[in-house]
Amino acid sequence: QIDWDGLILSIQSDKVDCAIAGMSITSERMQSVDFSDPYYKANIVAVVAGDGPYADVVNLTDLKGATLTSSLNTVWYDVLDQVTDYATKDAALDTFASMVSAVHAGKIDGFTCDMPSAKSILMTNPDLKIIDFEGGTGFEVSDEETDLGIACKKGDTELVDKINEVLAGLSQEDRDAMMDEAVAAQPASN
């Protein structure tokens, strides 16, 4: 397993051929690696204490007074800038385990991540709750921020083309089932 911050370097140095790691296809990352077509759209959600004051929020403004965080160098942390008029964006934490511990200890009220990560976290922390903002009540994000792609070495069009060929044959139902399988196989432990 390679740490998140080392994924792109591992691709560039030929340590791995590609990374399938929930990586959003951002223009910044595209300067360093090439991406496949999107394989999944990962909505950004909040994870809060199931019995806490924010367990029943339905839109962002319901987070008034909350202290929130996420992982540094992620879209999840960046979207917290959208709530700083009424909530606190706390210092980023390194792992999901540290975020979960911070919620349990009352140091933060919640954190943001994508839906697959949130589902994985709840498998081992059923006392938490996912807030899935729907119908325009959540974070404003672009496809660039939520479309996940497979990162490959810059210029490796042959590999990207092969990956895209496989992806083109997968229905949305197939993709959802594969993501659910992946989440079930590896509950978030960090």
Task: Describe each model-derived feature in a short phrase.
Residues 1-62, 135-143:
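Acidic, polar ligand-binding/catalytic clefts
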Residues 1-9, 55, 91-105, 116, ...:
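Short helix-initiation/N-cap motifs at beta->coil->alpha
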Residues 6, 21-32, 79-82, 109-144:
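A ligand-binding cleft/hinge motif common to bilobed small-molecule-binding domains
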Residues 11-12, 63, 103-104, 163:
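Hydrophobic residues within well-ordered alpha-helices
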Residues 41-48, 124-167, 184-190:
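Periplasmic-binding protein-like
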Residues 51-59, 91, 155-161:
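Short helix-loop capping/hinge motifs at secondary-structure junctions, enriched
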Residues 58-74:
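Short loop->beta-strand "edge-of-pocket" segments that line small-molecule binding or catalytic clefts
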Residues 75-93, 130-134, 161-190:
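Ligand-binding clefts/hinges and TM-proximal coupling segments of bilobed small-molecule sensing domains
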